[in-house]
């Protein structure tokens, strides 16, 4: 299965519109898309769910352990052709000085290819 993280160099760079477009395009070809959103966002997942006709799940380093993130992700990609994870802010942005809560860290944890 193809698995991607949509990121950018900074916030407000069009990640959401690109993620929605990708999910909608893949879904239009009768493929199953598993959408995810990094962080505690509640609006973007609604758009991603609408575009893919699948529930979108949040992957949040602040409310979940790495193991919980991996388990939630793994359970929800089982019947998918493609997974799309929309990042938040920039690729290396986060609160932790070591970058352990960044989009880059999430892509490494879940072995996702990054679309920047």
Task: Please identify what each model-predicted range represents.
Residues 2-17, 23-110:
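ATP-dependent carboxylate-amine ligase catalytic core
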Residues 111-116:
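Conserved beta-strand/loop subsegment of P-loop NTPase cores
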């Amino acid at each position: 299965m193809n698995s991607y993280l949509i990121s950018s160099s900074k916030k407000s760079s069009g990640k959401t519109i690109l993620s929605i477009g990708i999910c909608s395009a893949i879904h239009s070809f009768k493929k199953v898309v598993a959408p995810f959103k990094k962080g505690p966002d509640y609006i973007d997942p609604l758009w991603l769910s609408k575009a893919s006709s699948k529930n979108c799940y949040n992957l949040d380093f602040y409310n979940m352990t790495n193991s919980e993130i991996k388990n939630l992700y793994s359970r929800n990609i089982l019947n998918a052709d493609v997974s799309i994870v929309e990042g938040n802010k920039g690729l290396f942005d986060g609160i932790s000085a070591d970058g352990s809560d960044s989009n880059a860290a999430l892509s490494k944890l879940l072995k996702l290819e990054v679309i920047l």
